[in-house]
From Swiss-Prot:
It is an enzyme of class 2 (transferase). Residues 531-544 have a biased composition (Basic and acidic residues). Signal peptide: none annotated. This is Lysophosphatidylcholine acyltransferase 2. It comes from Rattus norvegicus. One of its GO terms (molecular function) is calcium ion binding. The lineage of its organism: Eukaryota, Metazoa, Chordata, Craniata, Vertebrata. Residues 80-544 are lumenal.
Amino acid sequence: MNRCAEAAAVAATVPGSGVGDSGLRPPMVPRQASFFPPPVPNPFVQQTRISAARRLQMILLGIILLPVRALLVGLVLLLAWPFAVISTVCCPKKLTHPISDWRRKITQPALKFLGRAMFFSMGFRVTVKGKVASPLEAPIFVVAPHSTFFDGIACVVAGLPSLVSRNENAQTPLVGRLLRALQPVLVSRVDPDSRKNTINEIKKRAMSGGEWPQILVFPEGTCTNRSCLITFKPGAFIPGVPVQPVLLRYPNKLDTVTWTWQGYTFIQLCVLTFCQLFTKVEVEFMPVQAPSEEERNDPVLFASRVRNLMAEALEIPVTDHTYEDCRLMISAGQLTLPMEAGLVEFTKISRKLKLDWDGIRKHLDEYASIASSAKGGRIGASSAKGGRIGPVSDVLRQLFALFDRNNDGSIDFREYVIGLAVLCNPANTEDIIQVAFKLFDVDEDGYITEEEFCTILQASLGVPDLNVSGLFREIAQGDSVSYEEFKSFALKHPEYAKIFTTYLDLQTCHVFSLPEDVQTAPSVASNKVSPESHEEGTSGKKVD
């Protein structure tokens, strides 16, 4: 981090902006719009405040309703179990063929009735909007937002389609048998081929022409607080068949159903819900959405379009959070940071910065070692004094100006990850190192003198009075630098790649700036590195 601080600071300093001798300038590349903070910072938290009057009401109602409803739910489950046995007896746990027609005709009507009876006994008042599509019209239902275990009511209303569920759930006594009666697609956490097998199974059933039951999928993959729609996983959209979006709403004054990573437990929510006079839920079946030819070839595009339609109907925003953000939240809590510190919008960060979960998790460890002692789990310039980043200095302030994307005086984990990837990302292949060496070797004698190094670096950064002698002395073993010395230093310290290749990378402003805000890059001193070489070195870059 210290070397990154030096590298970032060198790239950020220009004269005359009022910070020390050299001052501060805005980052060389303007902020990328797609990296702006999400409209909903944390969709995985729920804080329900219950007034004293409401508590008293719940206690009085609960004295009667809680035991009665618990008894009724238990009774319904016991009544449903024999039908589940008839539906699954002598059938393998992982079905290769659909349940026979005679089993369906005996069990399905009874299970549908008992499913509705169970939610009625729990106090749910269900409103259904729209028309349920037939298996031929839409083999797959996609349900959102997914916010609670009570969302199973969508399965009952849709006519008991198959679910995608963990293999362990099918092993649970009583409930496991009921789940198997729905002919679920089971996912194994220990099988390395589980994801591929699950997708193939969904594809096979979706394209069976109605032979299998419809499949109901919660594409978000985890529960949220219904304040937004997070990233849809592409599994339900890979078959390229029409899907029917299903919206869930819980329009109650007191929210007793939301089950998130930070909030009430399963038992607490059951007790709170059972103590309500009734709980309203709306299930809306939207028009069937058929994929275009382009969307058949790109399930992520199909998922994105369907998500946007559902968000528009719900009048809520979309974010790029996903289940991996939940894993990072848990990791942050284990590192004594606030759980929300781990939220980064994993889908967006991993896609745009080419980072996988392990890489971001490693950055979280680094971040925690700096921020664990800071208030609120955020890095501040003053709180970092004497720590790993170093004392508060002009260099540190310059680094903060680059990392602090929202200019609030502190760096959260999301800003930290983006800053490291953008500013300190190693970019030193041997070809780039060779071009960089030629850039500095003005007289083409195979060595870089201090004068050559300073002249080109100052010109390429647009900072004519920048002092880079210290950096030169760190590279050089004498009065000049050979190619082998230059290469050795660049490979050992990849964080300086941004400095060595600034001349070749000025076009990155097109990648990280808003289209209307793209500014003309400062002119730089030319040497014998030809324009053709420059184009070759940059033509592979992809503009966002």
